[in-house]
């Protein structure tokens, strides 16, 4: 299979040195993202597009390659093409007929030709000649340049002809690794996951920072969604997952701060801590999922007071977004189900939270706060590469993996229902039940405790996370199913 990758249009208007650097970075990222599917993958080209060529023929692997490229920052879209040596107009016609003749009978069509290099014909001459012949020879109903039912597309580059088979849209943005780094404050809900996606999509390397307010299940859930975002949209670069224990900070706020000011002061403490983490990692900016007036702490006066806790740039990609638009984006990128079923721990609840915080009042309340507690939280912050979050769950609990399911065991397919529908797990003689990851923790206690359950997912990441959580809750009848 051969692909022609079209880069994000904003890359093409950069100066030549910057443009080349960005495209080289994109080529490197593509190799990294696809190398486990094809170690011999070839990625060439350095100027306006890239050519990707693979000898892989298995449909499942090809579909996975296409899916990954559709989620790779820096790519506007890419074309599946058939390549031929360039001949004369009659030869071009024959190659187009080979791929499009079966699609044209009774259809309105158009021919689109893009050309680069020196040739004895123009792009328009190719379109007119090929279009006229196809209409006569293939039973087409007619030609429409403005509203065709079928587009016959080709690209001519020097002495090569590419007949386009299919186009796939990607997410645009700049290649990860070409721009600066950010640290996103993650709660695992709709807002923070979409904010993280927005910065990753734009091309900013995005590290994850979670403030643990006291819930182990919440921490595991945020680990899971952070790993999902990285694996789907950012796996070309290694980033960190940072967990900061904030239980003592919450306790100090509850005991020392006036009820109405708690929410704003908690956010200020988080920004202070995140700033210290970012400075330690030489990260350039913080990212939050706040939107104007979505909750009481997000009014303009409150955001201004919150931001005064740090000198670091705070990016808010969702600042003018409507909640439904955020939810729709989360659904599209695959984080909505994580967010809907994210375990929560709310340790700071203001009965009458202020919507117009005053700096002098906040300063007074913070003078009651023992800042040594914040320092202790930072000393206990745990940093781990995002691809190793599973290994860092704790050595005290061993998650057993099995390669084969035995009679009497039940395999729980915890993948998203759409993934189950696209590729159902079938094991002869073994009972397989679909139980989505987002419902597993609540519904597992309803299952027969005398049976053995094997958790299954495509990568083994979610299954290990949930097996670890269930084992830590005392369910000893859980293992992970990882077929060879």
From Swiss-Prot:
- What CDD domains has UniProt attached to this entry? PPase_ThiI, RHOD, THUMP_ThiI
EC number(s) for this protein? 2.8.1.4
User: Which keywords has UniProt assigned to this entry?
Assistant: ATP-binding, Cytoplasm, Disulfide bond, Nucleotide-binding, Redox-active center, RNA-binding, Thiamine biosynthesis, Transferase, tRNA-binding
Residues binding ATP are 185-186, 267, 289, 298
Q: In what residue span(s) does the THUMP domain sit?
A: 63-167
Keyword DNA repair in annotation: no
Q: Where is the active site?
A: 457 (cysteine persulfide intermediate)
Cite the GO molecular-function annotations of the record: ATP binding; CCA tRNA nucleotidyltransferase activity; tRNA binding; tRNA-uracil-4 sulfurtransferase activity
Ranges where the Rhodanese domain occurs: 405-483
HAMAP family annotated for this entry?
Answer: ThiI
**Assigned protein family:** Belongs to the ThiI family.
So what does this one do?
A: Catalyzes the ATP-dependent transfer of a sulfur to tRNA to produce 4-thiouridine in position 8 of tRNAs, which functions as a near-UV photosensor. Also catalyzes the transfer of sulfur to the sulfur carrier protein ThiS, forming ThiS-thiocarboxylate. This is a step in the synthesis of thiazole, in the thiamine biosynthesis pathway. The sulfur is donated as persulfide by IscS.
PANTHER family, per database record: TRNA SULFURTRANSFERASE
The protein's name in its UniProt record: tRNA sulfurtransferase
Q: What is the lineage of its organism?
A: Bacteria, Pseudomonadati, Pseudomonadota, Gammaproteobacteria, Pseudomonadales
In the UniProt record, the gene name given for this protein reads thiI
